[in-house]
Amino acid sequence: PVGAAILLSFSYFNTIEPPTFVGFQNYIDLFTTDATFLQYVVPNTITYAVFVGVGGYILSFFLAWSLSQLTHGVRSVMAIIIYSPSMTGGILISKIWAVIFDGSETGYLNYLLMDWGIISEPIKWLQSSDWLLPVMIIVALWSSMGVGFLSILSGITNVNKELYEAARVDGIKNRWQEIIYVTIPSVRPQMLFGAVMA
C-alpha cells in the first residue's frame, strides 16, 4: 500500500480512468497553489507529531518511572489503569471523550470548569478550531499508553538495585542523577522499543 501510494503520488488518478504519469506536478501544486496545506495542515501535523510522538514517549517514561516507585500491588493496579485505554476499542474511546468534551453545560469538563469558576460559559471543545487540536492530542496521549509504557515499566522494575547502591557510593545525590546515570542507561533496550511503539 505504501509503494502504491508513492507511485500514485506521481500520477493523475481519479479512480475512474487509469493513472496518468504527471511527474512532480502534484507536489508542485501542493506546495505552490494549496494555501490551506501550508497554512494549516503542515503546522498542525508537526504539532500533533511532536506532542503525541515525543510527548507520549516522555510521558510513558515518566509514568513508568513513577509507578516503579510504588509497592508491587499498587503498581500492578495503576499499570492496568494506565494500560487499559490501549485495549479499549476506538468507538468506546470516542464515546467516552465525547461525553467529557461535550460543548453544553452538561459536558463533564465544562461542568467542572464552570463549577470551579474557571469559565463562565461552556466551551465547544469539539467544534472550536482553537480547541480541537489540543483535544485530539490529549485523547491520543491517553490512548497511546500501551506496549511501550509496559516495556519501559518492566525495564525499570528489573534494574539491578545494586547499581543504585553503587551509584550512591560513587556520588549520586538525588533521584534526577539516578535517572540520568543509572535508570536510563539500564533500560536503553526497553526505551528503544518504547520509542518505536510511540
Predicted regions, residues:
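A structural signal for multi-pass alpha-helical bundles of membrane permease subunits
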Residues: 1-198
